[in-house]
Amino acid sequence: MRTERAELPFSWYFLAAAAVSLITSAIHVVAGTPEIMAPLLASTLPPVVKGVFDVMWHQITALLLLGSGASLVAAARPAWRLPVAVLIGGQFALISVLFITLGAMWFSSPWPMPQWVLFGAMTVLLLIGYRRGAA
């Protein structure tokens, strides 16, 4: 027997995920750019390598802002919650796994690259938000 899910009109979990994503994008741009991109762009790497890194850097900014916007819409629109939880949450989960795995490979610890904590938090908030969307 199938039961219908009664969706809550507003999700504070999706709103929280949107806020964390927005804050993460600000940290990425304000703190990360001078720490990571400035030395990389000042290096003697070939221009094409610098260009690709620059695109990748700004791509992450765009993905974080998109995740924030989609999560914000999903907070108010129940029909958006499953797609956002799966697509944005799945993307953030994979990024967390990358940080943990590559941190372990490069540094024998995930802590030199703690970004996985924020991406993991966003993933958890989106999944809880979807699961608790039923009244």
Task: Name each region found by the language model.
Residues 78-79, 90, 96-114, 127-135:
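Membrane-helix boundary connector in multi-pass membrane proteins
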